[in-house]
């Protein structure tokens, strides 16, 4: 899968990234790099990572997602994983995936609602 297929869209102060259905390791690495570059370039306050099309999760993908969540947090942003399928949730749990302070939402609309309504850690 070509890394050029990764879409990172800035909407107001947030980034929306839709993960391809079956990303290989190269695509997952490129996704992380593009997210971090966009966070730095735009100074965004949050990331919505739409994983609704993802059907399987391997250990590299799980680890990279967890690392990306942590890196976004270190850059001052918050992350919401949107649209996680039940099978992916089961696999993530079996792999011991911890998301730190990332939030989860059933879909992208709810993810944006969470980021727009939740207070930032700076104000807590």
Model-found features: residue ranges?
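STAS-typified acidic loop motif
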Residues: 4-32
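Short acidic-hydrophobic, aromatic-tinged amphipathic segments that line or gate anion-handling sites
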Residues: 100-111
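Anionic-ligand binding region
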Residues: 35
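Non-catalytic signal-transmission and effector/linker regions of two-component phosphorelay proteins
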Residues: 1-10, 120-124
